[in-house]
């Protein structure tokens, strides 16, 4: 059963969300998407989670797709983990006494890592995919960018997302993928990553850190550094040979989904 609705975040911003309820629910998974994309790009992952008894909550980050807010714009990086907290709180309210896991990809991985750092112990476990937790690959050059915050740059991320040409083509032609990215958003990555690094020891949740070693957008070293610096006792790092940025969309994605499911099941 699927339910789509607008959820009011901490500052009144309306976030588009979708809840898919598992028939024989064992746990809940909340998915946080990446820069310029939308929740529909996680349909295959959600379907696998559902079939394993995980109710799935997804939402669109502010300024993305069907959510409110200035397009691809953040005034403060804290808006990312605080919007996510709104969704996590909703999931807890609707699923009391059920473990709630968090899955974040790329910018959504930053969001999930920041959530775990700011609100430790709220998630039963966190899965990070190609997460922007450091800035070893200076994709946007030195931060902050010396441009007005309201400047918008073309979204040129498409070529680096995946080795599957069909995924690259679908991304380019997807009307819900944002075509412009604000300097304000990019500069908040710089501020947020500095904060994440300074507070690494505060991240203590169980975590599965996943990265493709052919990722041309977010450096594999970001995940290695994050993994090495956090305070979690239960932590696993997995680097996939020959995979690009979107490991959840690579041809071997179902094998990776199974590994995510297995990791969650071991913590129930």
Description of each model-found segment:
Residues 1-22:
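N-terminal cap/lid segment of alpha/beta-hydrolase-fold proteins
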Residues 26, 33-37, 213:
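Active-site glycine-rich loops that stabilize anionic/oxyanionic intermediates
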Residues 36-39, 65-95:
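Catalytic nucleophile-loop/oxyanion-hole region of alpha/beta-hydrolase
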Residues 41, 46-69:
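Conserved alpha/beta-hydrolase
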Residues 109-120, 126:
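Short glycine-enriched nucleophile-adjacent loop
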Residues 203, 209-211, 215:
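Short beta-strand/loop motif that positions the catalytic acidic residue
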Residues 205, 219-228:
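Short alpha-helix in the alpha/beta-hydrolase fold that links the catalytic acid
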Residues 236-268:
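Catalytic active-site module of serine/aspartate enzymes centered on a nucleophile-bearing elbow/loop
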